[in-house]
């Protein structure tokens, strides 16, 4: 297992992931008229999370304030800010009056490179393209992925069930995305949830890196956008499965880097877009 050196993590007890509110719900009580019924609802917390590298703010994402160490690490790897886990010397999570700051201490080499590639963005819910200064950064070239394992498609139904069962936040709120990492045998190794699909994936990629990048694949409750493909492939993961559809750019990018891309994953069916050589029927 790879660990961050000089790790400095501080979390606040009042940094919560869900909130309880009273709200009026309209329901058809007797099939003839609607009425307001007051009930308690559980909401997922969404707040600005700023990533600050060596004291300089780099990006602000709207996110759920959980697993923020994983988020910082995964984002840094997927965006090319760092090359390896050891490029981060410390992570400190600080609550502010407006949100959360994740202070990341970078190796000097990476910080110099970051200043050259600087982009400052204020994402909507997990939007990772907003604010890019150069269009080329959006469609950056990815290395070809190796083909190191084969997955039996008959195990996909079980994976979908495991991901559904493990969505603690999603079950409580109904408003979050979930991303799970599975072994080639279909074992659920980790799950991360967030109001933003890209942020949820960043959190999972951070976990994946800390574990030494084990073999396996990603299963997400969202669609497969080009950025989901880009982030997954850039971290060396060979397969991405989405419950919803893929976009055309996502498919083209998956073809270019040899990533197995699957969409519309449902019980008993799925759409294979690319690289079916990793699949066994």
Swiss-Prot record:
GO biological process, one term: Mo-molybdopterin cofactor biosynthetic process
InterPro entries: Cytidine_deaminase-like, FdhD
Top-rank lineage group of the source organism: Bacteria
GO annotation, cellular component aspect: cytoplasm
Keywords: Cytoplasm, Molybdenum cofactor biosynthesis
GO molecular function: sulfur carrier activity; sulfurtransferase activity
Database matches in SUPFAM superfamilies: Cytidine deaminase-like (SSF53927)
Active-site annotation: 127 (cysteine persulfide intermediate)
Location relative to the cell: Cytoplasm
Gene3D superfamilies per the UniProt record, alphabetical: 3.10.20.10, Cytidine Deaminase, domain 2
Residues at which Mo-bis(molybdopterin guanine dinucleotide) binds: 264-269
Described function: Required for formate dehydrogenase (FDH) activity. Acts as a sulfur carrier protein that transfers sulfur from IscS to the molybdenum cofactor prior to its insertion into FDH.
Family statement: Belongs to the FdhD family.
NCBIfam families: fdhD_narQ (TIGR00129)
Name of the protein in question: Sulfur carrier protein FdhD
Species the sequence originates in: Mannheimia succiniciproducens (strain KCTC 0769BP / MBEL55E)
Gene: fdhD
